[in-house]
Amino acid sequence: MQKHLPLAVMVLCCSTTMFAQNTTSQQPNKPTDENVFTFTEAQLGEDDNMTQNVTILNSATNAYASEVGYLFSPMRFRYRAFNQKYNEIYINGAPVNDVERGQFSFSSVGGLNQVTRNVDFSLPFESNNYGMTGMAGSNNYNFRSGSMAVGHRFSLAAANRNYTLRGMYTYNSGFNAKGWAFSGNLTYRWANRGYVEGTFYNALSYFVGVQKLLGNHSLSFATWGNPTERGTQGAATQESFWLANNYLYNPYWGYQNGKRRNSRVVTDFAPSALLTWDWAINNKSKLTTTLLGKYSIYKSTKLNYNNADNPQPDYYKVLPSNFYDVWGNILRFQTPQALADWKTAYEWLSSSKAHRQIDWDRLYEANRGASAQGADAMYYVQARHNNNLYLTLASTLTKNLTEKSTWNLGFNVAGNKGFHYQTMDDMLGATSFHNVNNYAIGTFAKNSDAVQYDLNHPNALVGKGDKFGYDYNINVLRTNLWTNYAETFGILHYSLAAKVGYDGMNRDGKMRNGLFANNSFGKSKTANFLSGGFKFAGSVDMSNGSVLSLGVGYEAKTPNAYVAFQAPEMNNDFVKDLKNELIFSSELSYQFSTSWLHANLSGYYSRVNNATEWTCFYFDDINSFSYNSLTKLNKVYYGVELGMKFKLTSFLDLKALGTISEAKNISNAHVRYLNSTQGTYNDDEAIVKGIRENGTPLTAANLGLSFHQAGWFIDVNGNYYDRIYLGYSPYYRYASALKAIGATDAKGNYIVSPQDKGKGGFMLDASIGKSIRLKKGTLSFNLMVTNLLNNQKIITGGYEQSRSDYSIKTDGTTSDRTYRFSKNPKLYHVYGTNGMLQVAYRF
C-alpha cells in the first residue's frame, strides 16, 4: 500500500503542478487503490436535491483544492459556489459539457472508477494543454488504453447509500510487443431499496478501449456508457418530516397492491465513443486530435392529474396547518372548528405510513370510474424526455519552444441536437386521454383552437408511449479557437491564455401550439453570439518554500440554450434582451511548503454581469404553469480559502481546511413571464438583490487526522457546514406582487422576505483500510463511514415554494390563506450514518 492515506490521494492523483503544462503520458500509471477514484452520489449528480452538479476539482499543490471536493461532497459542495457550467470537462482533449445546460453529467461515467482515475486537473488560473481554463477550473480525462494501470482488478462492495451492492471488474493489458493496448471495465450497482425509502437503483457501467502505436503516431478508440434506472427522492416541508417522524420522508412513492411504487423514476443512458489521434511530430511538438460523439437518453416520470384533486400525499391542502393557523396571527383561522380539523388531519396522517404516501389503488379506481363515463384519465404518469445527439472535433498542437516555455494552439467545433418531448408513460387503468391544454380551458372556450397543444392534430387521442403536451428540438452549433503560452525564468513563472468562439442556436417545434399558432411549429430564427476572453497568471518563488501567485481574467460567455428560450414548451420566442455574460475573475494566493507543512491561503473575487436565469413553476393561484426569465442580473463571488497539512510523524498527518465565501446577486433583475393559460407576456422587476447562491455551504471547515503505516490507513474527519441557502422563488419578489400586498415602506422601498436558509452543523466521517501483498497481487479491505454521529438535522438543500400566502379574488383584491407557503420551504436533510465496505483484489 502506498505511504499516503488513500482519502488524501483521492483528489491528488494525476494532477497538474501549479502553472505547469500537462502532457498526456502513454505509460501505465502506478497502481492506486480504487477507492481513490470513486465518485460520490452527489458528484455523479444522482442526488435529487441538486439543481446543479457539484464541482469535481483538484490540484497537486493546493492543500485546500486537493481535499474539499470529496470531503464536502455529502453537502453537495460546489467550488466557490460557482455553477458547474463554469467547470469545463474534457475527455482526451474534447469538450463534453452539455451544450444546452452547460454542465457535465458525471453520471455518464459513473462506475468507471479505474477509467476516470486518469485525469489532469487545472485550477482557474493554472495552464493546461486542452483549453483556456474555466472560472471554476477544468478537468481532462485520459481514456487512452495504454495510460491505464496494467492488470486485472476485481472488487465487491456493500453499502447503505443510493445503492447497496456493487461489483466491478477491470482489465488493462498495457502495450504488447506489437504496440497494442486493450482495456475493459464492467460495473454493476444495485439496490432494491436505497437509503431513502421508496428509492431503488439499477446501473450497469461498461468501458471498452483499444490503442495502437504506429511509430510516432497513436490511434485510440474507446466506447462507454452507464445505463441507469433509479427511483428518486422528493423534498418535503418540516411539517411533513414531523408527521412522519423521519427526516428522510419521501412523498414520491406509495403502495400499489401492497408493493412500493415510485412515481419519479429516472432512466439515463449516454452511450459515447471517441477516436483519438496522437502525433509526436518531433521531440518538441505534438498534435492531438479527437472526434467524440454521444447520444444522451434521459427520461423522468411524474404523476399528474386532470380535472381531479392533487394526488401528492404532501399536498398542502391535506396538511394540518392548512386548517388551523399555527403561526398565530390570523384569528379567523384559529376557531374551535379549525382546531378540530387540524386534529383530524394530524391523526389521519400520523396514524399510518400508507396515509402519508401515494394511494395508487385509489387512482386506478378513480380512472376506472372516469372510463366508465367516457371521460379522460383523471390521473396518469407522464414522462419528460431530454435527449441529445452530440458530435465534436477537437485538435491541439503543443510545442515546447524552449526548455522553459510551452505554447498550445487548439480548436474545437461541436454540433448538438436536443430532443425534448413528453410522453404518456402509464394511464393508470384509464382508456382515453386527449392532447388538450386543460389548464387553458376556462380562460378559453373548450372548443377554441387556443386549448390545442397541436393544431396539426387537434384533439388527438393519447395512448401509452404517445407524445403530448410539447415536442421540440434545440439545435446548437459551437466553435472555439484558443491558445496559451507559459514560461518560467528564474524565480518567475507566468502564463497567458485567450480564446474566441461562436455559438448559434435555434428551436424547431414539432407541435403547433394553439396559443401560438404562428410561432410554435417549425424552426425559429437563429440567435448568434460571439464569445471570447483572456487570462493571465503569474507566480514568484520567494525561496524557502514560499510562492506568491496572482491571476486575472475576463470573458464574454454565451448564454446556454437552456436559458435562451422564454417558453420552449410553447413557442419559438427567445428571452428578451438575451446577451453574453461578462465575467471578471481574480485570485491572489500564497503557498508555503516544507518537509513538515504544506499550506495554501487564497483570496478570490469574481463578478458576472448580464446573467440570465430561467425557471418554470406551477402557479397555483391561476392553475397555470409560469415560464420565467430573469435578465440583466449581476452577481459577485468572493471569499477566502485556507488549507494546511501538517506531517506530525512519518505515519501521521493533520490537516485543516476551510472557506468563508460570499456568492450573491448585487442587482435586481428584469423578469418576463408567460402563463400557460393565457399566452401573453408580462414584464416586471424582480427584487432579488442580495439573494445568495443555493444548494451549497458558503462556510465550510474540516479538521482531520490521517494514519498510514504497514499497509493500514485510518482517516478521521470532522466537518462543519453553515450558510446553506435554499433556492429562491422569483414570484415572491415581483415588484407588482409586493405592491399588491403593501410590502413597501414609507419611502417606497420594497419589503422583501429574506431568503430561506437551511440549518448547518457538524458531521464526523471516518475510514479504515488494510492492504495485504500476496504472492500474486494485492488484497485490500476498506470501510468508509459518513456521518458517524447520525446528525440528520443538517439541511443539504431545498427551495421556496412558488405560491403566495394569499389568494386573489375575482375583483382583484387579496385574501390571506391559512397555509403559509412562505413559512414552508421544501427541504432535503442530510443522510444519517451511512457507509461502504469494499474488498478488492488486484493481480
PLM feature spans:
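C-terminal beta-signal and adjacent terminal beta-strands/loops
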Residues: 21, 654, 720-742, 770-843
